[in-house]
Amino acid sequence: NMGNEILESFLQHGFTSAGYFYDDVNFNKGFPTEEKVVHSIRQQSEAVYAILLYLKYEKSQGRKHTEWENHIKKILDGFIKLQKKDGNFARKFHDDGSDIDASGGSTPSATSALVMGYRYFGKKQYLEAARRTIDYLEKNIISKSDYFSSTLDANCEDKEAAISAVTANYYMASVTKGKERQRYIDLCQKAAYFALSWYYLWDVPFALGHYAAAPFHQLHLFFVDADD
């Protein structure tokens, strides 16, 4: 019941005038005015992804949510308009679609949402837009091993960009065949190897009370973040 109430609340209050999800709401100050709305392509994509999983489950149970479907289609149609000529998406944008942060490193976040939209709605434009994101990723990110701009806060190099690239190519491989599919598998593998480089083995002492403290000479596997 609580989950349904949350979703119903989003239907009533969770969308901007342009049809996107509100990324951030301060309930002490109220909803941001239209000119102060800031959207992140990652947050919008992850929200679409989550709702499509919900809709897929509901559909399997014989339940249909037309209003939700219309909202998600509107957002995905908006993605097609937001996409640049080279296939990338601005990291952050205004409600009217104009760029706030034009960096394209968050582009793979949109790939998975577009592929899921294609599988759910059967709209080929979503798949074509997803294909173009991979063209951008291969040329500007994966081939250069320069994974950046996928965090929600800082615009920096980070493991999240590599993980997003892995996921994007995995999803593309799931809906394609032959040489095209193999291309995505190869790119997925390259990005996965880079993501692994953010993991290190440490054999060093840590101060007592530190979350990593353990007997000296014991090997630890730690996740190393750009913020650490």
Locate the predicted segments by residue:
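Glycan-recognition and catalytic cores of secretory/periplasmic carbohydrate-active enzymes
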Residues: 1-228
